[in-house]
A protein has these predicted regions:
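Function-determining surface determinants
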Residues: 1-292
Length: 292
């Protein structure tokens, strides 16, 4: 069934199953990397993010300190490849812009390609470091005290994630800077993952909400990639050999990024239009007939 709880299994068993599936998937990729460049790093980081979002659903039962401690450990695993992932994203974003706009940026492309190769060489052994860390995390999570956790507790966490997203949307509307959009995006993605976990409560409604959250997260993600590339290019402003390409590319990125942020804000206003208390009440209705 994948990244999803099952109504016929004990809730604690379902959560533990999800934890182990994400750990096993990440470790499996480390042991048997994908042949395509960048795929292993991307997929391992995705499994870690899904795991962290699922772990936070248990916060009210296991306690903030335990949850925060494990979250830090998982973030440390992700940081093993953060620089490599960043270099790959910058290069792929450039290639996407180049192809979509039918414009060539050969010198910048060479710069980012060489940068990616450098990080690939520097972090060539990251999988060997990640595997034992993942195994230890899996062992710890098997011992988490989840026997008394309820659907009500989990839905309460989701309602808080929704409210946090509303607050971050308001901040993004006010500031409209890359950092505000990035922070808002993290809340959107966490909510998307958590809705996927809760799908069995009301598959029709929650799959629709999850789909909207996914779309919003993708818009914000592309906008973040553009802002990320733009920040990297700003460091090359003094290079006269890149001057013409930089001017063209920066103009293109700003234009595309502005449009993505506009679309994200429009969708975000609709997605977060429901008051947080009304949202929490609507989610709670789904558990009325469920046994904890």
């Amino acid at each position: 069934m994948g990244y999803c709880l099952k109504l016929r299994e004990p809730l604690s068993d379902g959560l533990t199953r999800i934890f182990q599936e994400e750990i096993d998937s990440a470790a499996g990729l480390c042991r048997h990397p994908a042949k395509q460049r960048g795929v292993t790093v991307h997929e391992v980081r995705k499994h870690l993010k899904k795991l962290r979002a699922a772990l936070r659903l248990t916060k009210s039962e296991v306690g903030k300190n335990r949850c925060a401690s494990e979250d830090r450990c998982l973030r440390e695993i992700g940081r093993l490849v953060s620089d490599l992932r960043d270099a790959h994203v910058r290069f792929q974003t450039l290639i996407q812009l180049r192809d979509d706009a039918s414009q060539q940026f050969p010198r910048i492309e060479e710069l980012l390609s060489m940068e990616r190769e450098s990080f690939s060489a520097a972090f060539a052994g990251w999988q060997k470091q990640a595997i034992p860390k993942l195994e230890r995390a899996g062992e710890r999570l098997l011992k988490w005290p989840l026997a008394e956790i309820t659907w009500k507790q989990i839905c309460g966490v989701v309602a808080k994630t929704y409210r946090r997203g509303q607050n971050r949307l308001a901040k993004a509307l006010k500031k409209r800077d890359p950092e505000s959009f990035h922070v808002w995006r993290m809340s959107v993605k966490e909510l998307w993952y958590q809705f996927r976990v809760l799908r069995p409560l009301n598959r029709l409604v929650l799959e629709e909400i999850a789909s909207d959250a996914k779309t919003l997260g993708e818009l914000l993600g592309r906008g973040h990639d553009f802002a990320f590339l733009l920040a990297r290019l700003d460091k090359e402003r003094g290079d006269q050999a890149l001057y013409d390409e930089l001017a063209q590319l920066q103009k293109l990125i700003r234009k595309r990024g502005k449009r993505l942020h506009r679309d994200a804000l429009e969708l975000g206003r609709r997605f977060y239009a429901e008051p947080s208390k009304a949202f929490a009440k609507r989610i709670s209705i789904f558990i009325d007939r469920r046994k904890s």
